[in-house]
Amino acid sequence: MTVTEQGKRARATLAFMSQVDSEQKNKALNAIANMLEKNSDRIIKANAIDLEQGRNNGLSEGLLDRLMLNEERIKAMADGVRQVADLADPCGKILSEYKKDNGLLIKKITVPIGVIGIIFEARPNVTVDAAALCLKSGNSVILRGGKEAINSNTALSEIMRSALDEVGFVKDAIQLVTDTTRQSSADMMHMNEYLDCLIPRGGKGLIKAVVENSTVPVIETGSGNCHIYVDDSADINMAARIIFNAKTQRISVCNACESLVINSAIINEALPVIANELKKKNVQIRGDERAVSACSLVIPASDEDYYTEYLDYIISVKTVDTLDEAIEHINSHSTGHSEAIITQNEANAQKFLKCIDSSSVYVNASTRFTDGAEFGLGAEIGISTQKLHARGPMGLEQLTSTKYLIFGNGQVR
């Protein structure tokens, strides 16, 4: 089946999706969760093929980690689907209601976007998370994953579609594009007749290609060149603990810290402590001249390092003399995802919060919290780094649009 034919099928589901109620959606989601757990052996076997091919093709440790599914991760996916089922239905909410002098009653309500296309890379959990969120928000979804995860994604999509069929829910609300060539992605980018929105999830190259070439409206989920600034008033032990978590807890995710910015007044004392903590996970530290001088574990960085989302056990260090310099450096090198300041100075914290132009800004906490579940949104479709429609973790509410309902009694203009 071509991508265009899948688009037609997805469009044909909208009559059903516009009338489905919360109970039906939740029944379908719980059926998906149960079916995933019941078929964990099948999923793991399919995933093993992808992992073997990935190793043979030289995928990095970070990408293999993103790709890997085991019983624990499958259970987590199933539990995530159940959590989405437990969330309030985002559709049909009355955002405003007022009566005009002419007697017209006007209501503004939330409605599904329609058909959403998602192009992503080697993360099979996206297949399940995205499908669950789209279904709960009343949207149909066409999923196009990377070739690295095709066997895993095929198994997951077939299982989810079977679950929908079992409870009488239209199964074409979830479709997977099995053609992993660039042509299928290119086709989706121009399916304005069938897709209402396109969401890319992956590295800079994928996101850039979709944003620059798509005629379908795009919600951009940016890469994560996340920074932590260590202020001159920082608690050094707290800073080391937060940085260790933000960098090493899971290197392959977009909210991992990739770059440190350290005030020169504290660098000689702070950087050796931070570096020794990072050494526990063999993190390579690349820094400027002052960072290299401050700590023997630091090697020289290039200009390119400060723009790089490593997704690996590597971190860059930039030395600054002032908070203003730190803010300027971060805003000019960040991807607009997540940044943090470690400080005991309230005025500096407030200035950082106001001046940093990213979707999520932290004071004395790890950037790893930028996540739909951690924010109480349930699973997420991605982290939006743009400013229109959605910004930050995209949960159910961000997958809705609005509609005006106008009630009259014979009024004419």
Locate each region found by the language model.
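ALDH superfamily catalytic-core signature
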Residues: 122-125, 129-136, 163-166, 206-312, ...
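A structural signal for short, well-ordered beta-strand elements
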Residues: 18-19, 232, 319, 342
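Flexible, glycine/charged-enriched surface loops at secondary-structure junctions
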Residues: 22-26, 91, 170-174, 249-256, ...
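N-terminal Rossmann-like NAD(P)+-binding subdomain of aldehyde/semialdehyde dehydrogenases
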Residues: 1-106
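Rossmann-like NAD(P) dinucleotide-binding subdomain of oxidoreductase/dehydrogenase enzymes
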Residues: 86, 95-237
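Conserved C-terminal structural/oligomerization subdomain of aldehyde/semialdehyde dehydrogenase
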Residues: 302-413
